[in-house]
Amino acid sequence: ILCEFNYHTIGFTYTENDKKNIKKIYASESAAARQGKPWTKDILYRELSKVRKKAENKPYLLDEFLSNNKSLVHSSIFFVQDKDQGEKVAKVVSGYTDRFATFYEGKSDKFVNMLSTGKIDALVACERLNEGVDIRSLENIFLIATPRAKLVTIQRMGRCLRIDPNNKLKVANVIDFILESDNEKNKTPADQYRKEWILKLAEQKKV
């Protein structure tokens, strides 16, 4: 860990539309098995993760969180699954600052420079921004859509955990969406596992 950080979690549940999409996935899995082409667990998890990453009420919950934590929109990156989700998140962000940009494809250098020099407050971006980005002044990361791979989460968190020589007392913020469900079938161990290890990291303090 490079600098101290606060870990904020936003619990979310599936909407009726999300649940319908999950039922369709299990129906497709059953149909494939009947046809003699059973899915592997990886295929099933991948399909279910698409619903989790793009859960319908995430933009609304993000808006609710930002309304109580307006300062966190500044010096931040919002990681989303794709352009479709990104546009919904961007609409929420626009309610708190008009100094933001979106990045979904191409080269990120221009946007990274704008963020690092303070020309924009926030950047809504997809997974292409995971690696090779060094913005020492960056303070906040929003994990809107997070894959199961721990390495990807570490890379994303690393964007805001760099030591800033111009702000030696820097304390970053990691905001994460965690699935909460009463339905055992819909529970995602990946979210709970991620929450546990990030919480342990957040407890570490610099000496």
Language model region names:
Residues 1-2, 68-71, 94, 114-118, ...:
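Conserved catalytic network of the ASCE P-loop NTPase/AAA+ motor domain
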Residues 1-73:
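Interdomain helical connector at the RecA1-RecA2 junction of SF1/SF2 helicase-like NTPases
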Residues 22, 89-93, 132:
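Hydrophobic packing residues within well-ordered alpha-helices of enzyme cores
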Residues 60, 87, 91, 113, ...:
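Alpha-helical elements of the RecA-like P-loop NTPase motor core of helicases
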Residues 75-77, 121-122:
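Residue-level preference for the first positions of well-ordered beta-strands
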Residues 79-104:
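Conserved helicase motor "Helicase C" RecA-like lobe of SF1/SF2 P-loop NTPases
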Residues 99-206:
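Conserved RecA-like P-loop NTPase helicase motor core
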